Amino acid sequence: MDTRLSGYTILIVDDDPDILESMELAMRAEGATTAVAEDGTEAVQESERVNPDAVILDMMLPKRSGFLVLEELTKTDSPPVVIMVTANEGKRHMAYAQSLGVSEYLYKPVSLDRLINRVSTLLEERANQTHE
């Protein structure tokens, strides 16, 4: 069985329970350990608790926006790979996310296969950089 994400912990943050569940099932099917959060405040708390390798982050969240969460995540000593997923196609939002250090910016709806491929590729690239 193809388990490209074995050994990795992935935090999935989205306020839509259906999206959250489908992303979590897809990541687990690839061997990842997962944690979930439904709002920005919970996302920061979960990130501190599980120290994820990657975070899949919705931009529009209750309590604390995805941008504020991204800012917190990139301040850590070993920041995770962060993939922001959003239905908002504004170029300013993408530019702002990039200025904060987002690893990838994807528009909803995003296929689970594409999401898994991007997470896997970004984690592999990071692993290769640390071993050089």
Features from the language model and the residues they span:
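The feature encodes the CheY-like receiver
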Residues: 20, 62, 90
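A Lys-centered signature of the CheY-like receiver
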Residues: 108
